């Protein structure tokens, strides 16, 4: 029935899809003038009519049309067909079953659900300027795809598809993609290059090798494996291609962009393409109002130039976000877009050092842990599973037993390494992502000290969440990405879609206020003093990597959150003398740039000095806890290895641990003989009681198969129940038959109700020379015995 309905719907759509529309699908036709410019504007909240144009995106932007399929390397053609439409050369452009499944999902979910399509259908969809999400559009696309297959050759369709798909980083079409990522033509692409490009159209942002290298490498591996599975490449080619390096970010040639905020424009363009597709963004008549404030943008550049004066010295990136609505107000991704299009604000993932510690503290607060919890500030060894992680403080300075608040102000590595172990790296990753960090983060113990890769935009967004009293602000239009667009208008239809701010709670207001109160102390009396403003309170944190290769200051007021990174973009070069002959730390150049920018930015915004919400009194309760049975539990008075933790009243563990007086660990003795198991238990010391369980025929006896308890802890001297295999008393054990005559062996096995299988070998004639299973295992019905008997009769033996 479903296929019948699908066929009817398809037929109706086919009638409507007139042949005259086919020429309009040709990329050359589109490029010749069937396009409406898209325009990107800066924000102008005082007068929308005076919005400044940041960029104009035309249909031929970053696109070079190829005329013949022979201009594309055969391996590139194979790669894209393998991963996007393996039956491309077999079908007629439409998969009726696939359409039927998609229609059924649309009906079932009461909306339109995009599914997999053929290359022909994808090309038709890309070529359409109309991009509304309707069932009718789906059927119409399918009908046009079928018509296209009747008029065009497969090679022409594939070439048109490759000419129109978007590969990310401004590369529209296969020729521009080859030039952008590999500085060569589409005809020169190799297998690993082709596999990388073939994997990009599915999600150019997610699989971008300049921003998400691990995801990009996994996607390339998937394409290569698909080609191997389809017999397109050999195992040797697969291995060599997987080992090939990805293009480096600074090797990728991005299209030139003019205007006052080129790095920001490229970032916005990528977000729009992820939402609307390249066909609508380039030449689709979109008028996009962004969040960028050009006065703040110019100020950000000027602040960096004022502090970083040394030619050939380090570079800086700066991002400013209004915490109240999540809007990105300024973004400096480099000093010269002409020299390098690599965006330091969004693509440079560098270690944040101690500026990541507030995220660790935020994780603790979410678990109900109070900043009053105390740890010892001293060198510590953390068991990281595969190695011991030795943690020390900067310049060997320790402050003794201290709470989390003071440890933050003094940027104490030893304390925050212990806190990382306590709250757990996986929970820190969850908190970081919830705060707005989109970078991939590994849940290693070193995450607590900032040994992870993040970018300035991510860090600004996380701190903006702190500034907004624990609420991360996204937009309604572009999902959980940073809010860089105010609204999108269509010049074709007049439709206006606003990207309204939407707040998502991550921390409670109380938790965020506690964190902000602590970070204010960092600026007043800690490592961030150079960022202090004379007319208003500031909260923030410095960050410096061990080798002085990266330096950060991330801070905020209630009206603006700003991250500043300083370092050398092309290498992890130690900045040992760049601060007046001294090393560059987060409290030096980054803090100075931050202050230079904020002091003027807040005045230009006419932001009156505003105090943060006071942390107030938060009642706490100390609990003595222990890690037991996979969770923290309350000490019952007998637990070893406990610690005291201050929790917000009503939070923290409530279940009591089961610990014992004179507690010892119960060893695992399953699989051991009775004697060995008893000896292992006695060494603790623990006793043993034996419980016999029937052994299966053919299995060993006298071995422990179960114990109660299985691990855990008991008081010394307690008895552990051991379940030991015993033979069935009716049958006993299999006897040793080697050396017996065949007649005697059969008689003995007959008493056990066993009938052996006989094979012959060499040895003393007429005797058993080998038996299976061996003597000593449990006997019983159903046991398959095999005897190897030497040929001849015993009497024939000399």
Task: Set out the residue ranges of the language-model regions.
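Short, well-structured active-site flanking segments
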Residues: 89-99, 172-175, 234-237, 339-342, ...
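Conserved catalytic neighborhood of penicillin-recognizing serine enzymes
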Residues: 108-133, 252-260, 369-428, 468, ...
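Mid-domain, small-residue-enriched loop/turn segments at the edges of structured enzyme/sensor domains
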Residues: 140, 388-392, 424-461, 476-481
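Ligand-recognition elements built from short beta-strands and adjacent flexible loops
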Residues: 608-798
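Juxtamembrane regions of bacterial inner-membrane/periplasmic proteins
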Residues: 1-311, 328-329, 378, 418
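Active-site SXXK
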Residues: 78-81, 85, 222, 227, ...
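A penicillin-recognizing enzyme superfamily signal
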Residues: 290-311, 318-320, 331, 337-342, ...
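Short active-site loop at a secondary-structure junction
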Residues: 63-72, 314-315, 338-359, 371-377, ...
